[in-house]
Structure formats: structure tokens, C-alpha cells
Amino acid sequence: MEDAEVVLRRAPLFDGLDEESARALRRQMSDVKLSRGEHLFLEGQDGDRLYVVLDGKIKLTRAAADGRENLLTVLGPGEMFGELSLFDPRPRTSSASAVTDATVAALGHDALRPWLLERPEVSMHMLQALARRLRRANDVTADLVFTDVPGRVAKNLLDLAERFGEQDRDGLHVHHDLTQEELAQLVGASRETVNKALADFAARGWLQISARSVLILDIERLRRRAR
């Protein structure tokens, strides 16, 4: 497990702060430990704080009209979430729960607002993070319309590999910690269709499939399939 202070410095909230300011802001935060499957907040609840993942993985989900759960994203150490309610104080638009045992650092909006007023650069970094998230959401929407399921599977595996992959001489190990159903939700397709795509990739020698992880053997082929 990485040192919490090192992880926090990767978050947009701390980007650009000097050491003294970063320590002062850290003192305003409280740590929350979650067991696997435990909810941090639910869609529709009022939001009064943002969070940074210190350890483990957090997933953000949203309920569909028919009651099914849609997996929006999986977040790892250094990634921030829950900040939307700071700029738009309406109920939460998603639920957050632990994919693995996890620890997050929480910062209340009342403690954060003075920092944003005194340090416009912090506000700018947070807005840039929101812009990146919006751009990603637009890409996901476009993929659902224009990209076939195998292409979306490849693209999501590459995204997970970029954030959670560990390279060794065997290949790129991606411990995503997702069930088959969760991976299908992330892709936006049925579990059967996603499993068929994964089996095809494995048969071609591009990857090996394990429980809640994959070993990528030919990342270039996977990149071409994601285009």
C-alpha cells in the first residue's frame, strides 16, 4: 500500500499546492474505511463532501429505469469523486461502493470552499478534472452508438490496464477486481456477449483470463481492435 500522502498528491485537489498547504488541507480530511460491497453513498442522497481513493477500488453506479444497475466507472488510488455536488448542490447522481476493501479520504464542502476562494488554481485543477470526466462520458456515449461490443471490451480493458496494470515478463497483469457481471455493466452489454468477446481475444493469444483479472499478452492487437 502506498503512503496516503503520496497518493493524495496525485488528486486534482492537491495539484499545484506546496507541501505546507497540502499538509494543512490534509488535516481537514477524515479517512473512511469500507469493506468490499459496502456503500459510501447512494444515488439520490444529498452530497456534502468529496472523496479521494487512498487504497482499494471504488465503483460508481447508476440505476436504470428498469431497475438494473449501470456501472459508470471504477476508481483507484489518487482518483477523486463526489465533487460534482460542490458546484451543483443537488442530490447525488450515482452511488459509490467498494469493489474491494478500500480507504477513502473525505473533505466536507464547508471546509473546501475557503480553499477554493483563496486559491483559484485549485478551482481550476478541479474544473479541469470535471472537464476530463465529461469528455470521457461523451466518448462512452459515442462508443455505445458507433463501436461494436468487442471493440468496447478492448477499449475498457485498455483503460483498466492504464490505471491498474502491472507489467512483468509474462505480460501486463490487470487486476480489475470486477465480476463478470460488473465488467459487462462497464462495457454496456450482456455478460454472455462480453464473455464471448473475451474468449475470442484469448483464442487469438491476445490475453489470458483469470478470476477478476486478465493478463494482456499482445497490447498492440488489443489497441487495434479498440479503434
Residue ranges of predicted features:
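A generic structural signal for short hydrophobic patches within well-formed alpha-helices
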Residues: 22, 112-113, 222
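Cyclic-nucleotide recognition modules
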Residues: 73-135
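Long cytosolic regulatory regions associated with cyclic-nucleotide signaling
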Residues: 1-6, 19-22, 84, 91, ...
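Phosphate-/nucleic-acid-contacting segments
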Residues: 149, 156-227
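Cyclic nucleotide-binding regulatory module and flanking cytosolic helices
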Residues: 1-36, 85-86
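Amphipathic, well-packed alpha-helical segments that form the structural scaffold of globular domains
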Residues: 26, 30, 128-131, 135, ...
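Cyclic nucleotide-binding regulatory domains
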Residues: 13, 38-101
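Short aromatic/basic micro-patch
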Residues: 16, 50, 74, 106, ...
